[in-house]
Amino acid sequence: MKNINPTHTQAWKSLEAHKAELSNTTIQDLFKQEKNRFDDYSLTFNNQILVDFSKNNINQTTLSHLRQLAQECALDSAKEAMFTGEKINRTENRAVLHTALRNRTNTPVLVDGKDVMPEVNAVLAKMKDFCQRIISGEWKGYTGKAITDVVNIGIGGSDLGPYMVTEALRPYKNHLNMHFVSNVDGTHIAETLKKVNPETTLFLVASKTFTTQETMTNAQSARDWLLKAAKDESAVAKHFAALSTNAKDVEKFGIDTNNMFEFWDWVGGRYSLWSAIGLSIALSIGFENFEALLNGAHEMDKHFRSAPIEQNIPTTLALVGLWNTNFLGAQTEAILPYDQYLHRFAAYFQQGNMESNGKYVDRDGNVINNYQTGPIIWGEPGTNGQHAFYQLIHQGTTLIPCDFIAPAQTHNPLADHHNKLLSNFFAQTEALAFGKTKEEVEAEFIKAGKSLDDVKNIVPFKVFTGNKPTNSILVQKITPFTLGALIAMYEHKIFVQGVIFNIFSFDQWGVELGKQLANRILPELTDSEKVASHDSSTNGLINQFKAWR
């Protein structure tokens, strides 16, 4: 992968000049200028996903310069480097091959000259067998009862992805009840254990190293809880499985290593739901549906790898997003799914994007000070968000580009709920793009029988400037296949931006310092002695904590 500072490219210079040319052009103007704007600025995937990016402040010249930027930053060779197992995570000397986990063609993928696909398929086969035994009731707990509840214990990628997907695909769930524990706050595990029965609960401990502090603390508490009821160490093997590579510690914990599901160092945590980390997904929706999830992602992988840049959905979203942040001044993006099942989608890609591209050092080790890398990602489902934070998106002083996501078909066709939901989905992007002028506000008042003299003081507050950029992503229906494609689409968008930003998107050194300091502080909390080994603020906080506990 080539190291290219994007600001040194001709395309970046062209974009700077183009920004000035477009500075007095609004989205409203662009729709007047281009009669076929929707057709020219929308793309479809598999006749199941429509991506409309027409409500952005871009024209064909913008897109031409952005595509040139991708080419000058060697995007095509970077894509091939990832797909073919090159060690593009250079700070950890690792390949980046979440795409191999969903490689449904079994085309060989080599890491250090070795094809990884036989091992990938072996773990999938093992997962399939395990799911069949649990779902069918063949697997019994320590009293001979079948499993009714599954508790996934993990954190970060070992929690956010599986939790998001199992929630998104609840219409496909079987009889098993799924629970997710991540926070080292004892409240999380305690409240979960109140809901389950030790005789019928299976715990999945998701930690590659089997040493992650939060995960192992929660796993140990779950083990203690089980043994308090079972009073026999042999019960652990009947109620625990591990998603790990540390066979020694897994066995020491009491888990049968036959029920240990491996994954590899070329699988990053935030890209791991496609691996054994997705076992909770497969248990929740059945292995066939898990395979459909993989199939959807694989189809998006093929599209991303082979579609020309003009038709390439992840690349287009990445380039438009980069334009909004680096040239129009946005520092944040909102992901707004109009589907309650997708209520964790924004949180999932908050990690996916911010942990990947939240970097201030480029691939040459230089501090980045003349362009913006990853944006702040956040969001909530519609229509809840409309009654919470949309006010600022519409009338605030901060530019917030938004992705609106909605299914055309609902899993719950109750009365006219879905039409009302989608009417809001369509209305919001229209309102954000076109706004409401002073003249329109005044006309409304006149129609309501008011005189302009009476309302002149209120008119400014009811004006909407519009010109707020949005993407509309319409999905035919949220299924395992389309969800897999949607997730992969966002993964590749993040990758493209990381390539152009000239950063390493697949490490996360930013999480390490806090961990190191916490390990230093933990022993200081075991007694009541005052501490003086930190700065005055940290000392004061620790000492007050000791006084109050």
UniProtKB/Swiss-Prot annotation:
Query: What stretch or stretches form a coiled coil here?
Result: none
Q: Where are the transmembrane segments?
A: none
Mainly localized where? cytoplasm
GO BP annotations of the record are: gluconeogenesis; glucose 6-phosphate metabolic process; glycolytic process
Q: So what EC number does this one have?
A: 5.3.1.9
Which PROSITE patterns does this UniProt record tie to the protein? P_GLUCOSE_ISOMERASE_1, P_GLUCOSE_ISOMERASE_2, P_GLUCOSE_ISOMERASE_3
| Catalytic reaction annotation | alpha-D-glucose 6-phosphate = beta-D-fructose 6-phosphate
SUPFAM superfamilies named in the record: SIS domain
GO molecular function annotation = carbohydrate derivative binding; glucose-6-phosphate isomerase activity; monosaccharide binding
GO CC, sorted alphabetically, is: cytosol
Entry keywords, A to Z:
Cytoplasm, Gluconeogenesis, Glycolysis, Isomerase
Q: In which pathway does it act?
A: Carbohydrate biosynthesis; gluconeogenesis; Carbohydrate degradation; glycolysis; D-glyceraldehyde 3-phosphate and glycerone phosphate from D-glucose: step 2/4
Q: Name one Pfam family in it.
A: PGI
Tell me the active site.
Answer: E355 (proton donor), H387, K515
Q: Ribonucleoprotein as a keyword?
A: no
State the compartments where it is located.
Answer: Cytoplasm
Q: Give the signal peptide, or none.
A: none
Checking HAMAP family in the record gives:
G6P_isomerase
Q: Give the function comment from the record.
A: Catalyzes the reversible isomerization of glucose-6-phosphate to fructose-6-phosphate.
**Protein family:** Belongs to the GPI family.
NCBIfam families, per the entry:
PRK00179.1
- This one is known as Glucose-6-phosphate isomerase
Q: What is the lineage of its organism?
A: Bacteria, Pseudomonadati, Pseudomonadota, Gammaproteobacteria, Pasteurellales
